[in-house]
Each structure stands twice: as C-alpha cells, then as structure tokens.
Amino acid sequence: MLMKGTTTVGVKFKNGVIVASDKRATSGTFVASKSAVKTLKITDYAVATISGLVADGQYLVNNVRTIADLYSLDTERPLSVRGIARILAFLLRRYRPYFLLAQLIVGGVDREGAHLFNVDPFGTLTEEDYLATGSGSPVAISVIESGYSPDMDRESALRLVISSMTAALSRDAATGDGIDVVVIDDRGVNFLSREEISDLVREVLR
C-alpha cells in the first residue's frame, strides 16, 4: 500500500524555524494511517518534513541522519543545515531516472543562523523564508503569505503556522487527523506537546 498525501509547512522567525505536518496518510481515497509521522529529527538542531510517499521520505531521512551522525563523530561539530539539505538533494538526484517520490522541508539552526530549505523530488534545492508542500499546500501557503513578516517573533510565527495548518485541514481531504509542530532555535529541537498544540489551535480559532 502506497501511503501519501499531506500538508507540511515551514516558517522562519527572528531566532529560529517552525515546521508542522499533519498526521494523515492516504492511499487513493482510503485513509491508510491517522498517525503518520512526517516530521523527523535529523540532529539536535535540524528536522525534516515529508510530503509524497512516506516510505521514500523516511528512507531519505534515515540516510542523512546516519551521515550527519558520522560527520559529527569525525569532526566533533554538527553538520550544517545547508549540508543536510545538500545531501538530501544529492540522494534524490542519484536515483534518476527512478525517482523517489518525496519532497522535503529541512529546517534548523546552525552557526550561520536559522535556515529553511525546500528539496523537491528532482533534487532541486532552494532556501526560503516560508514553505508549504503537499496536497494542502495551496491553501496553507496563501495563509502564510498573507501574514508573514521576516521579523516575526516565535509566538507570532506559531500562530501563523497553526492558522495555515488548520486551513489546510478544513479544505484538503488528504490532510487531517491532527498536526505535529516543531520549534527549532538556539536551544535545539522542541516538539510541542499535544496540550500546547491544542491550546494554540483554540487560540487561533477563537
């Protein structure tokens, strides 16, 4: 069974990055999973979100996580966020003409600051201030574009991310079953609890 369909978003704020993804995985019109994990930790300061085929995305993230761990052991410093994104892009290009059907958002913080990268199935790599991928991305990106500011603080960025995800959940049939939200700043990767996310959703929908 091919599990796919999703909405993932990423937004840079003044001191970090926030990414989010829904939990629904579909196979055609069938809801294959209501608890799919599409936001995965790579290092203590970087994560990736997956849209497309879940298995392909997980395979790519597992590979780059291993490479990042080996790099850290060898050099005694973490692999940069740009380095992580470049490796993912290389892995995707390596499988041509047999594409891995996954698009990834890579978000994190390193010595150069906060970064947000888009890596598409062809291995194209771009750095952005905000992103949305997956079947619900047209809805999500319209919400983000209407409210984004480069100097947003953490709380404003969180509300914007939650607003974009709730809009996608309400309009896209392949998006649903809750969301995962991760904040990455100079303190590292922080997966928000269910209670924190629920409070934010209630605040946005109030």
Swiss-Prot record:
It catalyses: Cleavage of peptide bonds with very broad specificity. Gene3D superfamilies: Glutamine Phosphoribosylpyrophosphate, subunit 1, domain 1. It is found in: Cytoplasm. Residues 1-5 form a propeptide. InterPro entries: Ntn_hydrolases_N (IPR029055), Pept_T1A_Psome_bsu_arc (IPR019983), Pept_T1A_subB (IPR000243), Proteasome_bsu_CS (IPR016050), Proteasome_sua/b (IPR001353), Proteasome_suB-type (IPR023333). This is Proteasome subunit beta 1. It comes from the Archaea. GO terms for cellular component: cytosol; proteasome core complex, beta-subunit complex. The formation of the proteasomal ATPase PAN-20S proteasome complex, via the docking of the C-termini of PAN into the intersubunit pockets in the alpha-rings, triggers opening of the gate for substrate entry. Interconversion between the open-gate and close-gate conformations leads to a dynamic regulation of the 20S proteasome proteolysis activity. It is an enzyme of class 3 (hydrolase). Its EC number is 3.4.25.1. It holds the Pfam family Proteasome. SUPFAM superfamilies: N-terminal nucleophile aminohydrolases (Ntn hydrolases). Keywords: Autocatalytic cleavage, Cytoplasm, Hydrolase, Protease, Proteasome, Threonine protease, Zymogen. Belongs to the peptidase T1B family. The 20S proteasome core is composed of 14 alpha and 14 beta subunits that assemble into four stacked heptameric rings, resulting in a barrel-shaped structure. The two inner rings, each composed of seven catalytic beta subunits, are sandwiched by two outer rings, each composed of seven alpha subunits. The catalytic chamber with the active sites is on the inside of the barrel. Has a gated structure, the ends of the cylinder being occluded by the N-termini of the alpha-subunits. Is capped at one or both ends by the proteasome regulatory ATPase, PAN. One of its GO terms (biological process) is proteasome-mediated ubiquitin-dependent protein catabolic process. The active site is at T6. It comes from Korarchaeum cryptofilum (strain OPF8). GO terms for molecular function: endopeptidase activity; threonine-type endopeptidase activity. Component of the proteasome core, a large protease complex with broad specificity involved in protein degradation. The gene is psmB1.
